[in-house]
């Protein structure tokens, strides 16, 4: 009786050990994929900053945006663009800064959307394994 009990315990420990090892490998693979995705997003964001000549923080300050939502960006852009129109005594320089800020934020939204799509596909592939 004790012999069978010991065998059951050993077999149970082996099953749990294998399951734990498999889960650990999957978690490690997922964390590596996430780290790679974050690294790529950082490179894309840096490229967008050099292309537009403006950092994400500068663009957010110019358009007075705290969260990146397309509606808020468009609303603030339209308001600031109209207010700074040269015909109503505004500044062309500031108006051009507003345009560049919107371009930079639109680029960041595009990068974020691409990352979400890639992450979604990676999650689907991971769930299939």
Swiss-Prot record:
GO terms for cellular component: TIM23 mitochondrial import inner membrane translocase complex. Its main location: mitochondrion. Residues 120-129 have a biased composition (Basic and acidic residues). Residues 110-129 are annotated as: Disordered. The keyword DNA damage does not apply. It is found in: Mitochondrion inner membrane. The keyword Transport applies. Residues 58-110 are annotated as: J-like. InterPro entries: J_dom_sf (IPR036869), Tim16 (IPR005341). GO terms for biological process: protein import into mitochondrial matrix. Keywords: Membrane, Mitochondrion, Mitochondrion inner membrane, Protein transport, Translocation, Transport. It is a peripheral membrane protein. Pfam families: Pam16. Belongs to the TIM16/PAM16 family. Probable component of the PAM complex at least composed of a mitochondrial HSP70 protein, GRPE, TIMM44, TIMM16/PAM16 and TIMM14. Associates with the TIM23 complex. Regulates ATP-dependent protein translocation into the mitochondrial matrix. The J-like region, although related to the J domain does not have co-chaperone activity. This is Mitochondrial import inner membrane translocase subunit tim16. The lineage of its organism: Eukaryota, Metazoa, Chordata, Craniata, Vertebrata. The gene is pam16.
